[in-house]
Amino acid sequence: MIKRGLALLVLLCMALPCAGMAEQTEARRVVYLTFDDGPKKDTPELLETLSELDVPATFFLVGLSVRAFPEYAKQIVQAGYAVGSHTMAHSIGRIQKDAEFVLRDLARFEKTMREEVDETFSTDLFRFPGGSTAYKSRVKTLVRDAGYAWFDWNTMTGDAQYTFSSDQEMLDYTLRQTEGK
């Protein structure tokens, strides 16, 4: 199911910029595929589909998941996908309470990636667990000053919140999320 669902989503992404170009003469709409919280057990299938369709993507990995599935994290890096930190443990509450914790967590993530995946690994990409709006400016300043650029999202497939009965249902949900964006 993931392969068909992803293929439908990729086709949607390919169509969105064209539709946007018809209505917008100065700006081009762009869709970036990003995947959070991995690697997971379905990562190999996802990578295969992305490769077959020649689609770029960015993966925001969690250090504990990297430890659980180091081979999948290696596959992501070796395939040339952009990789960012989604922290070591996805500890939303801890980061909100202790601004400096985010820096320690980012360092732990990068150390884990170097130990488990590639000894030369380094990234300046970051995604806050739960999105950046949940965090105070002090945390954001620390992240920026440490050399990271953070990225949020404006559309979600809903796969983390809902169980869809079909690929079409997930695609329809995602399309509704893109309206006006």
What are these model-derived regions, one by one?
Residues E23-K97, F101-T123:
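Active-site beta->alpha N-cap acidic-glycine motif
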Residues I2-A22:
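Sec-dependent N-terminal signal peptides of Gram-positive bacterial secreted proteins and lipoproteins
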Residues A15-L16, K40, V66, T133:
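Generic "edge-of-domain/loop-turn" microfeature
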